[in-house]
């Protein structure tokens, strides 16, 4: 019988204080059946991204947090608690390192062998750092991406446009709602029926189609009426994409969010019955990976053909181009990644995916923060529109939460305002504030966040380490450094932070420091790379950068 984990609700503590209760509840929330993709295996999202190495380690982490003092710090090594040290009251309560390998050993083969020996785990980004909030966690970023694409190519609106994509897992599941929020029509190919049904249950997806003909009828009707609609097609992208090319059905926009970063535990090859594919993963992994590579090559060839015939095509951060390139598709990088194509200007302003979670479990606490945004940021029409749409259309998974993109200065201001509401009792329990590792200054990923940097610094990995170090010094409640998130082992290093608003003076000081230094590293990283918008932001915000003026 599989274990079911759910974070406690309310104000009763199970630890010695909220500084310990917060990470404990968020670890548990990552494994809530409403949140995690495979909670019985400790897998949260992203193929095999886990919250803890095994159930024994999970129990030991919980016990350690329950016993942790206010001047101690717990160390977690790839999902396993390995030490508790006396530090001080304003230090982080938890420091996490996940999936890190010495560079020459940093590939999937080495990683899987070490994982098999029980020595490591794959933490993805927010799985092993205990700040995953379900599909909403990537929703605004996806909304912003499709919105930026609409601005660039279609005068700011996807009305009457046919968007093709694939993958409805924890990350890809945000795509259908993000497209319809931008008024488009989207066909999402997904091989797993349960994932399609899950997205419908949580109102991220409108309809399911059993075959391509049925799906295209729905697409054509919605496009002709310029009516937003999302359709989940049960099928394999490596079969459906080439079939659409063969039929001459060229979408307006094409991307993909299958788990191509992991050709064993993520991607599913074409022409295999889904249950059999899952068996083959374990029975003959080498054969499975060979089939995955072949399917990815066909998948990307079809995307290139769509581009050749006039579609807007972009990589959505799953490293599918790299996998295809390795398999001999030499033009795989002819279509761009989403960050250089659409998102980098926001990074230059210190903007990124800012999220917060109500530890009380009461949705009213999140609704109060929604009103706070509308009250205090009323001059930001784009942000207010997002908050209103999220309030109307986003279903909570696990502990109630919200996400929006805020920039340098805005994050610290909002953090203080939330802390004030907790202090006044207008919010019932502390609010946890964190972000995705996909942020302006916290990641080095040459095929994704740092692709095509102006100065050629795509692979420079000092920046996420500096981000983690300054946020530790600034007093984030927990800080994490990971390897391989999003694009797979060997292709990225990245850092995460979480800081809590518990209404105290201590929290106010931490929030001011952390929510300034964290986006600040994004500004300095982009100034250093020569981006004029980042220089303008640094000048306006008074960011201290020694060798630049």
UniProtKB/Swiss-Prot annotation:
Its cofactor is NAD(+). One of its GO terms (biological process) is L-histidine catabolic process to glutamate and formate. The active site is at residue 404. Its EC number is 4.2.1.49. One of its GO terms (molecular function) is urocanate hydratase activity. It comes from the Bacteria. Pfam families: Urocanase (PF01175), Urocanase_C (PF17392), Urocanase_N (PF17391). Keywords: Cytoplasm, Histidine metabolism, Lyase, NAD. Catalyzes the conversion of urocanate to 4-imidazolone-5-propionate. This is Urocanate hydratase. The gene is hutU.
């Amino acid at each position: 019988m599989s274990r079911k984990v759910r974070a406690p609700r309310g104000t009763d503590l199970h630890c010695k204080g909220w500084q310990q209760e917060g990470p404990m509840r968020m670890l548990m929330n990552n494994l809530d059946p409403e949140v995690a993709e495979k909670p019985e295996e400790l897998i949260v999202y992203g193929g095999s991204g886990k919250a803890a190495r095994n159930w024994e380690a999970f129990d030991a982490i919980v016990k350690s947090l329950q016993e942790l003092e206010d001047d101690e710090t717990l160390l977690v090594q790839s999902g396993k608690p390995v030490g508790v040290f006396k530090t001080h009251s304003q230090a982080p309560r938890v420091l996490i390192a996940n999936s890190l390998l010495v560079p020459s050993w940093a590939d999937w083969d080495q990683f899987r062998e070490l994982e098999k020996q029980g020595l490591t785990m794959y933490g993805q980004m927010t799985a092993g750092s205990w700040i995953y909030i379900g599909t909403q966690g990537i929703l605004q970023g996806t909304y912003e991406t499709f919105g930026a694409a609409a601005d660039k190519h279609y005068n700011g609106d996807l009305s009457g446009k046919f968007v093709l994509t694939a993958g409805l897992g924890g990350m890809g599941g945000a795509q259908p709602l993000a497209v319809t929020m931008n008024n488009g029509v989207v066909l999402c190919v997904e091989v797993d029926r349960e994932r399609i049904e899950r997205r419908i249950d949580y109102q991220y997806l409108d309809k399911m189609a059993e075959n391509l003909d049925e799906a295209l009828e729905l697409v054509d009707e919605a496009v002709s009426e310029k009516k937003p609609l999302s359709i989940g097609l049960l099928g394999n992208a490596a079969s459906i994409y080439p079939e659409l090319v063969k039929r001459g059905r060229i979408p307006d926009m094409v991307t993909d969010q299958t788990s191509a970063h992991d050709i064993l535990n993520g991607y599913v090859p074409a022409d295999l019955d889904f249950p059999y594919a899952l068996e083959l993963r374990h029975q003959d992994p080498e054969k499975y990976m060979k089939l995955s590579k072949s399917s990815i090559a066909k998948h990307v060839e079809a995307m290139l053909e769509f581009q050749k015939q006039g579609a807007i095509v972009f990589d959505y951060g799953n490293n599918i181009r790299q996998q295809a390139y390795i398999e001999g598709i030499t033009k795989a990088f002819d279509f761009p990644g989403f960050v250089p194509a659409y998102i980098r200007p926001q990074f230059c302003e210190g903007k990124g995916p800012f999220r917060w979670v109500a530890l009380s479990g009461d949705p009213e606490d999140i609704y109060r923060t929604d009103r706070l945004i509308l009250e205090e940021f009323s001059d930001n029409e784009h942000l207010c529109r997002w908050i209103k749409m999220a309030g109307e259309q986003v279903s909570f998974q696990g502990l109630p939460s919200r996400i929006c993109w805020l920039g340098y200065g805005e994050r610290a201001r909002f953090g203080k305002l939330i802390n004030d509401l907790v202090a006044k009792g207008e919010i019932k329990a502390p609010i946890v504030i964190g972000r995705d590792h996909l942020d302006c200054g916290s990641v080095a990923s040459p095929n994704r966040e740092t692709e095509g940097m102006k100065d050629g610094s795509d692979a420079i990995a000092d920046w996420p380490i500096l981000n983690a170090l300054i946020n530790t010094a600034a007093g984030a409640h927990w800080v994490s450094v990971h390897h391989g998130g999003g694009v797979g082992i060997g292709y990225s290093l990245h850092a995460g932070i979480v800081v809590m608003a518990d209404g105290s003076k201590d929290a106010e000081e931490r929030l001011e420091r952390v929510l300034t230094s964290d986006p600040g590293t994004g500004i300095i990283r982009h100034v250093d790379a020569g981006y004029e918008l980042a220089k303008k932001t640094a000048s306006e915000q008074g960011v201290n950068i020694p060798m630049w003026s």
